[in-house]
């Protein structure tokens, strides 16, 4: 939808905007936009908001360099709030935190301990560390070495998985597979591919008689 007449701005001419990392799915921040800010966002794909305290439009990262390239914009069912899905550069929060929502009021008492949930959490942590590059972080060190370094690690870990499987060493196979998955998730994050993108490919290969092979068609 590009017809802004369907948006319900409040009496001050503003609409709340929730901003989400398009890669990890993490909620980064919540702000407001006026009509001009929304129009500028749609025209430039630069996340643009309206500051209620300063009474002016502002572009995320214009001063800090922590920019947000807008991948897509969505409107909720009532037309009175927006979702910006962005590619975040650096931390989103002015405190230096990856997300403005870093202070829990209620902790998750039953986190998803299955493979899906674990991979999503690890991927989210990787994208957060890539955004902030904290000193001493393994992710930061890998990133500093360039993509070739992590690709070499993937090759090494794949070899370890093969060896552990050949030796039928279950504990070692689980450990080496975890290492392989971690470094693969890192490579995905570096090039902007999410676990959801991979899941979509796998789901597309599901046939009535089971998973289709990578080369199978139809």
Curated annotation (Swiss-Prot):
Residues 1-118 are annotated as: Phosphoribosyl-AMP cyclohydrolase. Its main location: cytoplasm. GO terms for biological process: L-histidine biosynthetic process. Residues 119-218 are annotated as: Phosphoribosyl-ATP pyrophosphohydrolase. One of its GO terms (molecular function) is ATP binding. InterPro entries: His_synth_HisIE, HisE, PRA-CH, PRib-ATP_PPHydrolase-like, PRib_AMP_CycHydrolase_dom, PRib_AMP_CycHydrolase_sf. It catalyses: 1-(5-phospho-beta-D-ribosyl)-ATP + H2O = 1-(5-phospho-beta-D-ribosyl)-5'-AMP + diphosphate + H(+); 1-(5-phospho-beta-D-ribosyl)-5'-AMP + H2O = 1-(5-phospho-beta-D-ribosyl)-5-[(5-phospho-beta-D-ribosylamino)methylideneamino]imidazole-4-carboxamide. One of its GO terms (cellular component) is cytoplasm. The keyword Metal-binding does not apply. Pathway: Amino-acid biosynthesis; L-histidine biosynthesis; L-histidine from 5-phospho-alpha-D-ribose 1-diphosphate: step 2/9; Amino-acid biosynthesis; L-histidine biosynthesis; L-histidine from 5-phospho-alpha-D-ribose 1-diphosphate: step 3/9. Keywords: Amino-acid biosynthesis, ATP-binding, Cytoplasm, Histidine biosynthesis, Hydrolase, Multifunctional enzyme, Nucleotide-binding. Its EC number is 3.5.4.19, 3.6.1.31. It is found in: Cytoplasm. Gene3D superfamilies: MazG-like, Phosphoribosyl-AMP cyclohydrolase. The keyword Thylakoid does not apply. HAMAP family: HisE, HisI, HisIE. In the N-terminal section; belongs to the PRA-CH family. This is Histidine biosynthesis bifunctional protein HisIE. The lineage of its organism: Bacteria, Thermotogati, Deinococcota, Deinococci, Deinococcales.
